[in-house]
């Protein structure tokens, strides 16, 4: 499965780079940015196969999302070309921001898996128990992913203030606001999990709320257009 996953990620990379990288610059349409984010997500999830048994359920969703994102990028038309090849600071900011989003998305899938396992355990209708990961392990990996994503989002916000001259401009300020709100939501969630042992619906609600705010912050202007 790992070898097949690597081949799939390579094909995803080739397809996305052909759509994203143009002779006059980089084509940052919503479909292409989404395909790039899903590429980072698929690559990370595939490498995680080597260490985490808990990744099997999320992996199915990740690969399905990757296939759909590539298909949409190939079908969708549009042009939003920018040339950032010589702006190392901006490349770093965009890269770390997309990777943080990918990790938050994977953490969200883990939250769904955690909720499902918790419900099955309570109802005592859990089949194939030997094939499923322990609930505590899934919970620990969920916390680890969210913490790593939060750290990257912090770096993304700081680098955005440094490298984006219009970070607080009127036409861009909504991105800073929604992304900062997402940061606060995730910070509260992490504190609740670490200090007060939150789990179940409360954690899932925080994870969903954070993803919604972050999606609006990252892609809101593209969606409006």
Where are these regions (language model features)?
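Structural signature of hydrophobic alpha-helical transmembrane segments
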Residues: 26-39, 170-182
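Juxtamembrane boundary at the C-terminal end of a transmembrane helix
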Residues: 216-225
């Amino acid at each position: 499965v790992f070898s097949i996953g690597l081949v799939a990620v390579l094909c995803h990379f080739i397809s996305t780079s052909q759509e994203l990288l143009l002779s006059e610059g980089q084509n940052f349409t919503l479909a292409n940015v989404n395909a790039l984010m899903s590429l980072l997500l698929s690559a990370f999830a595939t490498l995680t196969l080597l260490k985490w048994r808990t990744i099997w359920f999320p992996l199915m969703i990740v690969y399905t999302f990757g296939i759909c994102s590539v298909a949409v990028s190939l079908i969708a038309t549009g042009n939003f070309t920018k040339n950032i090849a010589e702006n190392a600071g901006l490349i770093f900011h965009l890269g770390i921001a997309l990777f943080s989003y990918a990790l938050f998305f994977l953490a969200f899938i883990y939250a769904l898996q955690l909720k499902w396992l918790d419900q099955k355990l309570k109802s005592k209708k859990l089949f194939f128990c030997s094939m499923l990961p322990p609930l505590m392990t899934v919970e620990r990996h969920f916390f680890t992913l969210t913490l790593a994503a939060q750290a990257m989002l912090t770096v993304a916000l700081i680098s955005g203030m440094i490298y984006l001259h219009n970070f607080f401009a009127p036409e861009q300020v909504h991105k800073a606001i929604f992304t900062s709100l997402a940061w606060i939501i995730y910070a509260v969630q992490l504190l609740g999990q670490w200090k007060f042992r939150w789990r179940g619906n409360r954690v899932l609600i925080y994870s969903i709320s954070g993803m919604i705010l972050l999606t609006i912050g990252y892609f809101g202007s593209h969606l409006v257009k």
